[in-house]
């Protein structure tokens, strides 16, 4: 089976086409107190149905190093204070921010939260300092069928595609 990975980017916050959630019970909050277990647990819970496998073999030490890294910021999405999803932003030394992981728990998919969650991720990426030159993400054909459309709807532009056999 061929898996296509698509890379998208945005070079200005003005490119963002926002989508808000009208339901006030849906909220997004940064995890100010770092907890690598939160990152690990959400990686498994969100990524299970999308075949996120590369980090399943990580040890607790690897998760701790990743989750506590100063360049990483993690945000949780909540609906009526129930955890609904998350995203991770990782800044590099060149002034680029990657939306490293992004997704909703299965029971919250299809409820109109994805666009609002991605809007928040992109807005928060542009707020990171010092100045940010680019926000980028990659998705693949194993991800949610609407993932690529959501990224493009928010104003992200494809800059590369790669195909690989699984």
Describe each model-derived feature in a short phrase.
Residues 3-8, 136-138, 157-166:
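Conserved catalytic-core motifs of GNAT/GCN5-like acyltransferases
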Residues 91-100, 109, 131-133:
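A conserved beta-turn-beta hairpin within the catalytic core of GNAT-like acetyltransferases
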């Amino acid at each position: 089976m061929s898996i296509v990975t698509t890379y998208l980017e945005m070079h200005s916050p003005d490119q963002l086409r926002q989508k808000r959630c009208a339901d006030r019970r849906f909220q997004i909050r940064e995890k100010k107190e770092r907890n690598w277990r939160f990152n690990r647990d959400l990686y498994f819970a969100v990524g299970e149905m999308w075949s996120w496998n590369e980090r399943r073999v990580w040890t607790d030490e690897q998760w701790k190093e990743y989750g506590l890294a100063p360049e990483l910021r993690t945000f949780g999405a909540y609906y009526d204070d129930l955890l609904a999803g998350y995203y991770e932003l990782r800044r590099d030394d060149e002034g680029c921010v990657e939306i490293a992981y992004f997704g909703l728990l299965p029971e919250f998919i299809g409820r109109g939260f994805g666009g609002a969650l991605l809007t928040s991720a992109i807005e928060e990426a542009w707020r990171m300092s010092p100045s940010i030159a680019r926000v980028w993400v990659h998705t693949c054909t194993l991800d949610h069928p609407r993932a690529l459309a959501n990224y493009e709807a928010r104003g992200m532009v494809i800059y590369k595609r790669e195909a690989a056999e699984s």
